[in-house]
């Protein structure tokens, strides 16, 4: 957590062990401000490789879309400067600007992977560490569906609902060849009559590595066309017993032909 100001103890306004952080509510457990535990398989000081998200030249050619003064402008990432870490973006109207990664991430469009071998990836995430969820593979049957029938509540409503059953691969990195560390198992279903929102019920099941035998359970609403979607972590087993927290999902790539997507999950768990 970045420092937002000096931490001071107010003996008069707060009991001993209660600390006030300017601009934030005091949250204390045994006299220590509570912070989420976010163990990560990839060390924070590990050098960033050229294949890491937001790391450089491989983003050249990616498309962007920016909202400015009441309209959207489409553009392309044309150059990455290694020394400054800035990305040059040229827009359809002839204008251009230099953006850092945090700014570029805000306008970067999902990558269409329909002509790429990365089709085999469906989800990318971090559940206490960096993991991948991959869907289609040889022998995989994507048409695993539960069909239910409900009474149509309004004209034009489609009574048949399809609920995909998910049993996908968890890997250390986004590459197809990355080491498998577990499975992502669960269901999702359309659960919004007005917008495209899903009900997600997922278990991240770790079968290898430090968290082998442990699971993390995620359950909540996923408005998949929103830029960032937040869902609750409602529990866990093994290393994540009594776990609680939240997950933030962000679409990284989407295949318009197969429907497969790569989604980055940042998961924060108190346990």
From Swiss-Prot:
Glycosylation sites: 255
Gene3D superfamilies the UniProt entry points to: 2.30.30.140, Allene oxide cyclase-like
Polar residues bias spans: 1-12
CDD domains the record matches: Tudor_AtPTM-like (cd20401)
Top-level division of the source organism's lineage: Eukaryota
Cell compartments where the protein resides: Secreted, Extracellular space, Apoplast
UniProt cross-references to Pfam families, sorted A to Z: Dirigent, PTM_DIR17_Tudor
UniProt keywords, alphabetically: Apoplast, Glycoprotein, Secreted
Disordered: annotated segments: 1-22
Aminoacyl-tRNA synthetase recorded as keyword: no
GO cellular component: a single term: apoplast
Role played: Dirigent proteins impart stereoselectivity on the phenoxy radical-coupling reaction, yielding optically active lignans from two molecules of coniferyl alcohol in the biosynthesis of lignans, flavonolignans, and alkaloids and thus plays a central role in plant secondary metabolism.
Quaternary structure annotation from Swiss-Prot or TrEMBL: Homodimer.
Similarity remark: Belongs to the plant dirigent protein family.
Name listed for the protein in its UniProt record: Dirigent protein 17
Gene of this entry: DIR17
